[in-house]
Amino acid sequence: MELQTLQEALKVEIQVHQKLVAQMKQDPQNADLKKQLHELQAKITALSEKQKRVVEQLRKNLIVKQEQPDKFQIQPLPQSENKLQTAQQQPLQQLQQQQQYHHHHAQQSAAASPNLTASQKTVTTASMITTKTLPLVLKAATATMPASVVGQRPTIAMVTAINSQKAVLSTDVQNTPVNLQTSSKVTGPGAEAVQIVAKNTVTLVQATPPQPIKVPQFIPPPRLTPRPNFLPQVRPKPVAQNNIPIAPAPPPMLAAPQLIQRPVMLTKFTPTTLPTSQNSIHPVRVVNGQTATIAKTFPMAQLTSIVIATPGTRLAGPQTVQLSKPSLEKQTVKSHTETDEKQTESRTITPPAAPKPKREENPQKLAFMVSLGLVTHDHLEEIQSKRQERKRRTTANPVYSGAVFEPERKKSAVTYLNSTMHPGTRKRGRPPKYNAVLGFGALTPTSPQSSHPDSPENEKTETTFTFPAPVQPVSLPSPTSTDGDIHEDFCSVCRKSGQLLMCDTCSRVYHLDCLDPPLKTIPKGMWICPRCQDQMLKKEEAIPWPGTLAIVHSYIAYKAAKEEEKQKLLKWSSDLKQEREQLEQKVKQLSNSISKCMEMKNTILARQKEMHSSLEKVKQLIRLIHGIDLSKPVDSEATVGAISNGPDCTPPANAATSTPAPSPSSQSCTANCNQGEETK
């Protein structure tokens, strides 16, 4: 059949996936293995989608068969055992389809078995969100399996809760096929139907005319947080002891054959009435993860506990797993992991005892502590568990979480700025997986938390997977080593891993040799990559820096603004200097022109003085001539004739001989007569 071939192909791909997972544990930094792992996960997802379509087709066929009146009998699929064996390692889509398919059977058989005895075990569970199922996959091994079969894949029991129904459950767990009959009797509003599918085949019989079936659709919760770096794997191994006490339940009506699997009991109580020793579940301490005690807590003040004990052939310790829902819309998983290398003794489950209530704190004391900034021990544990909060992937099986093998994230820039150590002591490369300094987390009590809800002021119930180690306390992962880290895993230049230098302002990392220019030593203090430096200089986009980085970058922006203003002032100063030089040159030119003008003025004034002196001489000459004319009128004619004749005139011989004295004056007068006329 097509479904069987798909399951075989899925089985082969899952085996290859497990081999790759083992190789990734040896070499978690290998990029090729990561690529192969992602491709293999894509193949598995595609196969699961095909199987989903096949299951939907089978469901349609069942609906068609249901429409036939009078006789209707559901035949078990021959591949049910194979599906149950491979369900643990298939993705969440396959688990959802199988759960819907089995719930389809359960609703059909619900109307066929209304006559159940009162001695059979009744199960009630608290209401959950409409159209949301919570798959819980647990491994169980039988006590009669031979030693050669112990290593094979164990049986899987699936617990499915569907809204708006409440059923009475009757199970007989045997080595033979399990007959599972449920009644549609409604015992209370808001309750839910619970179905348990065990190993081998499931036979469901319906004799009355069927009713239309409503199949709930699963809506995966939105991913509000990034993928976790580590998810614990719930794999309880078989244990040898078969005398594990469990909270008592009404005895079954049928003759009890030898039990292959221990009975499954679900109890419900509210925090107002604390459980007694008969219906309470003692929390089991974890050594190396064997028997699982799973407590599921709801914030509606109701608690549903599921206890499953799995006997086996080997001696091992118990294991405690606690699940809760912090809100009605999202589920978070917080993991505390502590390794245990030496197991000195195997622990067994003690008889059930009532869990201790949380210590009552005085409200005035709490208010005083809050005003001082102090916290109580319970609040401290809550804060430390919140620091390790991780978002679980949509796959219910943690084996398929691809985030398990992602590389360790590096410290964020806020860590370096908030740290009190010297900035030069920052080391290159990836920080260690576990912090060397023991924090408060290592000093918390290793005993598991009580199985009842918190006090009313702490209505937020937390989801924890607790694996405490009893021998040696190993420090918890540093809360700052992975929380809020945004850095990449590979060098931004060569895209390879190794010892990387992280930028304190962005998510990029670099090798020292890949930088331009390359660095020889680790820079002290805050280091900014070249891209961030260019970005801050260009101011292409504003980056909202968180926390202390906002102060740093505001100072950087202030310095950049001051530097820019300084550059502007320097440029202005240089422009002014250049303009001054030009003005000085103009001043020199003007001074030269002024000096030339002054020289010309001086020359003109000198010539003017000379002309004035010459005029004075002419005037004196004229006066002399007038004086000669008055004294000697005879000679005046000759003098006037000499003046009128100019330089070419020659006095007569008698005049020259008779008046020799005025002859030089007449000569000077004739020499300057023309110049005097010009000046006049």
UniProtKB/Swiss-Prot annotation:
Subcellular location: Nucleus
Zn finger residue spans: PHD-type: 488-535
Record-annotated DNA-binding residue ranges: 425-437
InterPro entries from the UniProt entry: Zinc_finger_PHD-type_CS, Znf_FYVE_PHD, Znf_PHD, Znf_PHD-finger, Znf_RING/FYVE/PHD
Cross-link (Glycyl lysine isopeptide (Lys-Gly) (interchain with G-Cter in SUMO2)): 65
UniProt keyword annotations, A-Z: Chromatin regulator, Coiled coil, Disease variant, DNA-binding, Epilepsy, Intellectual disability, Isopeptide bond, Metal-binding, Nucleus, Phosphoprotein, Repressor, Transcription, Transcription regulation, Ubl conjugation, Zinc, Zinc-finger
Positions where Phosphoserine occurs in the chain: 447
Required for transcriptional repression: region residues: 486-680
Residue stretches in coiled coil: 558-603
Transmembrane residue ranges: none
Gene Ontology biological process: chromatin organization; negative regulation of transcription by RNA polymerase II
Segments for region (Disordered): 82-118, 318-363, 440-463, 639-680
Biased composition (Low complexity): 84-100, 651-671
Primary location recorded for the protein, binned into one broad class: nucleus
Cysteine disulfide links: none
Basic and acidic residues: bias regions: 327-345
GO cellular component, one term: DNA repair complex
Highest taxon above the source species: Eukaryota
Biased composition (Polar residues): 444-453
Tissues in which the UniProt entry reports expression: Highly expressed in brain. Expressed at lower level in other tissues, including heart, kidney, liver, lung and skeletal muscle. Abundantly expressed in fetal brain.
Modified residues (Phosphothreonine): 350, 444
Subunit structure: Component of a BHC histone deacetylase complex that contains HDAC1, HDAC2, HMG20B/BRAF35, KDM1A, RCOR1/CoREST and PHF21A/BHC80. The BHC complex may also contain ZMYM2, ZNF217, ZMYM3, GSE1 and GTF2I. In the complex, it interacts directly with HDAC1, HDAC2, HMG20B/BRAF35, KDM1A and RCOR1/CoREST.
Disease: Intellectual developmental disorder with behavioral abnormalities and craniofacial dysmorphism with or without seizures: An autosomal dominant neurodevelopmental disorder characterized by impaired intellectual development, developmental delay of varying severity, impaired motor skills and language delay. Additional clinical features include macrocephaly, obesity, overgrowth, craniofacial dysmorphism, epilepsy, and variable behavioral manifestations including autism and attention deficit-hyperactivity disorder.
Role description: Component of the BHC complex, a corepressor complex that represses transcription of neuron-specific genes in non-neuronal cells. The BHC complex is recruited at RE1/NRSE sites by REST and acts by deacetylating and demethylating specific sites on histones, thereby acting as a chromatin modifier. In the BHC complex, it may act as a scaffold. Inhibits KDM1A-mediated demethylation of 'Lys-4' of histone H3 in vitro, suggesting a role in demethylation regulation.
Record-given protein name: PHD finger protein 21A
Lineage per the UniProt record: Eukaryota, Metazoa, Chordata, Craniata, Vertebrata
Gene from which the chain derives: PHF21A
